[in-house]
């Protein structure tokens, strides 16, 4: 209640000017040590202070809310909403605990250790590409491509499909926050295509397992349980979106 008494008027998080000059909008709040801000259109609260964030994350009275935020914006159906219903980041215990335990089974110490040489190789390849141009945008040429390339490699997604993965994940990420109608439509279209692609990928790994993360997720077990097809698809897509 003390925090809410000092929360300023709501902020439109979809305003491009906000992200072009965030310091001009948030600077006064931070300098005055205002602890939180409201997100216009959702009733959501942004916490700014590390201690408050840690306390909120450990408070059992607070939860992930599932798809409630989407529904509050009138987005109640379609591929994006369905994906979020099965997305680990939108779940609370015990569902979240179960999925996390299964996914952790697939991220073995050996698999994580093998990422270092892969990461070095990909980084060198991207830097070599950058050196061929007189001027480059580091974000577009490296920062955006590097993590997605690593995740795609872990999932054994062919190099030829990496560009399509980037387009899909860009559309999905554009739909987070307070998306426009066109952004919602693009995200739904991207999710529908990704679900089909990932479904085919899972079927291939079921019939011909490899030493990749998809195969690891398929065969991961915890207390006799494993991921079903819907959970597998949602998890693989979440890894790709997180790696964007």
Predicted regions and their residues:
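Alpha-helix boundary/capping and short turn/kink residues
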Residues: 93, 112, 159, 207, ...
């Amino acid at each position: 209640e003390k925090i809410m008494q000092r929360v300023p008027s709501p902020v439109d998080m979809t305003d491009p000017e906000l992200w072009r000059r965030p310091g001009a909008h948030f600077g006064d709040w931070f300098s005055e040590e205002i602890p939180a801000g409201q997100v216009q259109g959702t009733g959501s609260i942004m916490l700014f202070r590390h201690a408050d964030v840690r306390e909120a994350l450990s408070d059992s009275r607070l939860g992930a809310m599932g798809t409630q935020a989407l529904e509050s914006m009138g987005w109640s159906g379609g591929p994006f909403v369905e994906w979020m219903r099965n997305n680990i980041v939108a779940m609370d215990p015990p569902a979240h605990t179960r999925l996390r335990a299964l996914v952790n089974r697939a991220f073995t110490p050996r698999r994580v250790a093998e990422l270092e040489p892969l990461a070095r190789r990909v980084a060198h390849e991207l830097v070599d590409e950058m050196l061929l141009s007189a001027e480059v945008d580091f974000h577009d040429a490296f920062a955006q491509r590097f993590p997605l390339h690593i995740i795609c490699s872990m999932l054994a997604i062919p190099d030829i499909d990496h560009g399509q993965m980037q387009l899909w994940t860009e559309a999905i990420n554009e739909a987070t926050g307070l998306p426009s109608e066109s952004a919602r439509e693009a995200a739904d279209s991207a999710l529908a295509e990704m679900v089909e692609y990932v479904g085919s990928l899972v079927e291939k790994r079921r019939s011909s397992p490899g030493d990749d993360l998809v195969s690891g997720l398929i065969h991961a077990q915890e207390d006799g349980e494993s991921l079903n097809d819907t959970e597998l698809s949602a998890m693989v897509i979440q890894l790709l979106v997180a790696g964007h």
